[in-house]
Amino acid sequence: MSVYSALRLLSGKPELDLLYVRTVIESADKGLGALPGDLEEKFNPYMAPLNDKLEEMLPHNTTDRQTLLSEGRISAMPINFLRGASWNDKVVVADEAQNFTFKELTTLITRIGQNTKIFICGDSMQSDINGKSGFSDMCKLFNDYKSKQKGIEYFEFDESDIKRSAILKFIVSKLNEGRKSVN
């Protein structure tokens, strides 16, 4: 939904660019180790979710996709390299934010300049950083009236919002049951 919203904001606004940000935390217990290549080649596997959504919404053969990519209007960056940046005229999608620390999220949101929107997406059930995630705390911090008045919105999906598949809806329901019984 965030990529869809970002692409909608980009359409008809040539001054805006899309920046995809995520962490290089792996979801498996055992990492692959160092990846060969330059920064772009190393980060490319982490861009798979963005590429999947772009393919779904803007197939390879569409002029829109080719134009956005060739003009450099879609780019990606790991959270590690944000310090010092200032974003104007950007639509930022921060994905897998449950794997960002509070400090990393602070770095992310303090890059906001003029005409910038940030979508911070995450699922606290899927954190891979063992209690170090700042995602839930950041959500709580900005889920108030003052933030809403400034245009900061918080939205949490639940099981009824799942569209991927019926089996996934069942799986999430069972995981939530298990989580409630443990707590």
PLM features per residue range, with description:
Residues 1-94, 98-183:
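Conserved helicase motor core of SF1/SF2 NTP-dependent helicases
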